[in-house]
């Protein structure tokens, strides 16, 4: 009989644009989402925390390598409770979820602050297959050189302990400046 050591680990990588102008669409790309443990994890999730400087518009779920059903939930700045955006999604399919404020029925001063994919129990080796994306727009009125920091994390429980990983992405907002040239007499 051979006793295998338990190895736990999870990963996520988030990328996006280095620069953006106010009002410009932004696409965040998520990769390397996986349970790299050699054991199953409970309450497995991956989450994106959206900064105040962006407005969520659309989510492309990606697909995953183990047959499960999962849900996508979100929080807003006016509620600490999760609301369900989509439920009973199949990990073998890619879904495009409309998440514009009007579609979600948000108040004028309300915005999505967090989106979370909730999978439950995943086996060792659970991983994304097709890439998930989150689309947002830089809010208008942002100052030149404003920094937008977006944080994604992934995690799961093993024997009551959270196994987690974090990825951050920085986008600098720049505003267009109009330069008036002097008129010449010619």
Which functions belong to the PLM regions below?
Residues 7-9, 23-27, 41-43, 112, ...:
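A general secondary-structure signal for short beta-strands and their flanking turns/coil
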Residues 16, 32-34, 136, 154:
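Hydrophobic beta-strand positions in extracellular immunoglobulin-like domains
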Residues 1, 30, 95-148:
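Low-complexity, intrinsically disordered segments enriched in Ser/Thr together with acidic residues
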Residues 11-17:
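Short, compositionally biased P/S/T/A/G/V-rich stretches that sit at domain boundaries
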Residues 1-11, 136-186:
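Extracellular/luminal low-complexity Ser/Thr/Pro-rich, glycosylation-prone repeat/linker regions
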Residues 18-50:
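Short beta-strand elements of extracellular/lumenal beta-sandwich folds
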Residues 45, 49-114:
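A surface/secretory-pathway sequence property marking extracellular, secreted
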């Amino acid at each position: 009989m051979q006793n295998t050591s338990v190895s736990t680990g999870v990963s996520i990588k988030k990328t996006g644009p280095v620069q953006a102008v106010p009002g410009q669409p932004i696409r965040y790309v998520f990769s390397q989402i996986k349970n790299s443990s050699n054991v199953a994890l409970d309450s497995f999730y991956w989450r994106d925390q959206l900064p105040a400087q962006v407005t969520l518009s659309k989510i492309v779920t990606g697909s995953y390598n183990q047959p499960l059903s999962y849900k996508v939930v979100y929080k807003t700045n006016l509620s600490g409770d999760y609301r369900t955006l989509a439920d009973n999604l199949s990990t073998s399919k890619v879904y495009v979820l409309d998440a514009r404020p009007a579609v979600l029925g948000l108040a004028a001063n309300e915005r999505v602050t967090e989106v979370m994919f909730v999978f439950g129990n995943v086996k060792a080796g659970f991983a994304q297959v097709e890439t998930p994306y989150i689309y947002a727009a830089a809010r208008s009125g942002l100052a030149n050189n404003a920094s937008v920091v977006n944080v994604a994390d992934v995690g799961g429980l093993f024997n009551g302990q959270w196994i987690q990983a974090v990825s951050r992405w920085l986008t600098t907002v720049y505003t267009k400046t109009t330069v008036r040239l002097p008129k010449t007499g010619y």
